[in-house]
Amino acid sequence: MKIELDVHTHTIASGHAFSTLQEMAQAAADKGLKVLGITEHSPGVPGTCHPIYFRNLHVIPRRMYGVELLLGAEINILDGKGNLDLDEDYMKMLDIRIAGIHSLCYEYGTIEENTHGMVQVISNPFIHIISHPGDGTAALHFEPMVLAAKEHHTLLEINNSSLKPTRNKPNARENNLTILRLCKKYEVPVILGSDAHISFDIARYDNLYELLQLTGFPEELIMNRDVKSFKEYLHL
């Protein structure tokens, strides 16, 4: 399968990643990508950049080494009400907006409360992608999320990093299989995410191909294959 884009990656600005923006862009060019998303963690994750970082993204060229850059953030979902940790004024400055649950800054609720919050975020017009919904950080009902994603043209991410053995996320494999099966059933597109924290991991989806094969997931529902389809679906 041809891959044209990877839009969930982090640079040293996130505080716990290990490559610069230019190193990431060069690696994307070396791998033949057309589009690279740089999505730094928002303030709820310890050690990440201050919100003023996002205010200054305008100084960065949107094309490096022949690769188009989408500069944005991975915004933290804070609770079962769907509250986020980055103000709308900052979100408006971003090319792409991902939202996800991280244990360091999430107020856990029941599975129903967690799911309600996630559906609220999926329906938020500022949010394009939900990061690693299947990693098991919070208990979730996936079917309402898939249906909401279809209604609002929000992409659910199938996250490669969550399936690394070193991540110790025992429910990630089965959760992602469930999400893929539901998305196939309801014909809902997904996005593959490397969640790269170092340049070598850009467009690395090696942990996902088995899941795609097991579910017989249609290639036409994978948004990484074609930049034009990706942008049209998200109205970018």
Where are these regions (language model features)?
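Extended substrate/RNA-proximal surfaces in nucleic-acid metabolism proteins
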Residues: 2, 29, 42, 47-158, ...
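Short hydrophobic alpha-helical runs that function as membrane-insertion/retention elements
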Residues: 36-38, 157-158, 190-192
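Short acidic/histidine-rich active-site segments
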Residues: 188-202
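Histidine-centered catalytic micro-motifs
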Residues: 4-14, 38-41, 130-134, 194
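Metal-associated gating/positioning segment near the N- to mid-region
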Residues: 12-48
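Conserved short secondary-structure transition element at the edge of the structured enzyme core
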Residues: 176-191
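Histidine/acidic-residue-rich catalytic or RNA/ligand-binding cores of hydrolases
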Residues: 15-18, 47-51, 139-146, 166-180, ...
